[in-house]
Amino acid sequence: MLKPKRTIAELKELRELTADENGAWRVAWTDTWLKAREWFNRKLEGLPVEQHYDAAGNNWVTLRGQSEKALLMGGHLDSVPGGGWLDGCLNLLAGLEVLRRIAEEYKGNPPVTVRLVDWADEEGARFGRSLLGSSAFSGTLRPELEKDRTDKDGIRLEEALRRCGVELSRMLEAQVEQKNAAAYLELHIEQGPVLLDLGLPLGVVLGTFGVERHAITFRGQAAHSGSTPMHKRKDAFLAAAKMASEIYHITDRNGGVSTIGSCVTRPGIVTSVVAECTITLDQRHLDAQALARLKFEAEEASQRFAREGGLPEPEWQTIWRIEPILFHPKLIEFCDEAIREVAGVSHRLPSGPLHDAAEVARAGIPTVMMFVQSLHGISHNKIEDTKEEHLELAVQALDKLVSKTMDWILGR
C-alpha cells in the first residue's frame, strides 16, 4: 500500500542527518554525501531488490519483473552547499515509496522490471560539472575533458572520484545500464514560481531548456579617470553595461530567459577608465530556433555597442552549449492524466534548470518529468519548501504515472 506520509517522514529524517541551520550539505564526493547514500541503502532492507553502483557511481536498485523491459525512476541525494531539503532527494524517496507499493502488490514479481537510480553528482557543486553520473550513463560525458578539474581546495576531480571507488577513465562503462530501459520518470520540485503563481500543486514538464552560455569581452583603453574627458574615453564597461539592459529587450521579443551573471573589469581600480570588461551571458529556451535568435541578437547588440564606444569587435568565448530536450509526448499525456486524477487540474511548463532526465532523454529513452509546486519559488536555498499536502499529492501522482507507464511498456 502506498504511504506518501512515509516519504515526508524520510525526507525529514534525511534532513536531520545531513543538514544544519544553514541548509543541506550533501555535496557529492564528500563524507556527508556518502553518509546519505548509506542511509538510503539501509532503507532497502527487506525489499526483494538488487542494489549496485555502476562505473560512474550511480546507485541502482532493481526489482526484477516478468519482463526484462525496465521502467526507470530517478533522483539524486547530492545537494548544493546550504541547499534545501527536497531538491533531488524528493525524487528518489518518492520513487522508493512507489517501488515498495509495486513490490508488495505484485509479491516481488511485477509485470515489468522496475529500477530506481540515485544519480551521482547531479549538482556539480564541488567541481563545476553538473549531471556527471547521468551524462556517463547517456554517453555524452567526455572524461578526458574533465580530468583537470579541481575544487576550491585544489583537490582533483579524479582523486575525489577514486576515493569513492570511481575511476574517471571508466565512467562511460555506465552506459551498460541503458540495456532494456523502456521509460524514465522523474518527479522534482519546480524550483521556480510558475505553479505557485497559478495556485496549482503539480505540473507536467514538456522538456528542458537548451542553453547558450558565453563569456563576452569588450576591450577599450585604460586612462586616468580625472584627466580624460568623457567624450574621449574608450570605456569597455560602458559597452558591457548597455548589454545588461538590452538582453531584457531581446528576451521579451523571443521568449526564454537570459542572465548576465558576472562582470569582471580590468584594471579594476577607481582611478582608471576600464580597459577590459568580461561579462558572462546565459540564455535558455525550449525552442532551438528561438534560442539561436537569442544568441544572434545578443551578438549583434554587443557589436553595435562596441562600435558606438569606439571599441574593436568584442570577443565571444563559448563556455557551454546544450540543445533543448523535448520529453516523450505519450508520457506527457500519461503525466497529465495522473495529475488530473489526484489534483483535478494540470498545467504544462518547460524546465529552465537542467536535470538528469535530460541526459536520459538524450540517450533515446522515452522520458517525462513531473513538477510539484515550490513555496517562495525558491530552491538551492535553506528556505526551499513545499506544502506537505502537495508532497503527498506528488507521490500519489507519480504512483499513477508509473502504473500507466508500466501498462504502456507492456503493450509496446
For the regions a language model picked out, list residue spans one by one:
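Midchain, well-structured core segments that form catalytic/ion-binding scaffolds
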Residues: 121-122, 126-289
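A short beta-alpha structural unit
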Residues: 25-29, 261-269, 280-286, 313-332, ...
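Catalytic-core environment of secreted peptidases
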Residues: 43, 47, 59-90
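His/Asp/Glu-rich mid-to-C-terminal helical/loop segments that flank catalytic regions of hydrolases
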Residues: 206, 224, 228-253, 300, ...
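Alpha-helical metal-binding/catalytic segments enriched in His/Glu/Asp
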Residues: 73, 82-123, 212-218, 224-251, ...
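Zn-dependent metallopeptidase/amidohydrolase metal-coordination segment
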Residues: 7, 12-17, 74-75, 275, ...
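N-terminal capping segment at the start of a domain
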Residues: 1-31, 145, 378-379
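A non-catalytic alpha/beta surface segment that caps or lines the substrate-entry region
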Residues: 19-64
